[in-house]
Amino acid sequence: METCLTFQSHLSPPPGDGCRSPTEMEHALNYSELLKANDDPERWECPLGFDYASEKHRFQQFTVAFAAALTITPKIETGACIQDASFHSQLIFPVGLARFHSLRFSNFASFITVKDDDDVPSEILSTILVLADRLGYTYIPYNYLDADYTGSITGVTGIDSWWIRYFDYI
């Protein structure tokens, strides 16, 4: 029996019954192709035309909705906290008493992700997916980012995975 990710009732569910299986979600997008298609061979921190002010505003909208939906107060890192990186902001949120995860917001293609998302409770991951859809983000499952980087950027050493390409300090 396949696991069903359900969406909280106070958030707008996706079309249908408000339930998507992980398999259905992964079949909806070809993540490997999406990562390659948005790779910029010349710009490694952000694409041409990246509007930092707009992205920061959208990140703030996500943060407010995320905190309200889950009744938690995530730690916010953005602005001067993040430099020389392929992402612009992150939310650090608790999972249990002593564990934290970070939800990162890439400078490329409105990508977002949580590193090691297999450990994130389904309620939190479902909320992230609903908010991503509502605010125009594309959630990339971490297992696709942990793969070897096969993109077109040259001249920058240390980019050996898609995680580093889109969601890490460079």
Map each language-model feature to its residues:
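N-terminal, Lys/Arg- and Ser/Thr-rich interaction peptides
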Residues: 2-46
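Acidic, proline/glycine-rich low-complexity IDRs
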Residues: 2-18, 119-170
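Exposed alpha-helical structural elements
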Residues: 30-33, 61, 127
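Eukaryotic intrinsically disordered, low-complexity regulatory tracts
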Residues: 36-44, 48-49, 65-69, 73
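A short, highly charged nucleic-acid-interacting micro-segment common to nuclease
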Residues: 44-60
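Short cationic amphipathic helices and targeting signals
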Residues: 49-52, 109-120
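Well-ordered, non-membrane alpha-helical segments in soluble/globular domains
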Residues: 55-63, 121, 125
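Amphipathic, interaction-prone secondary-structure segments
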Residues: 60-113
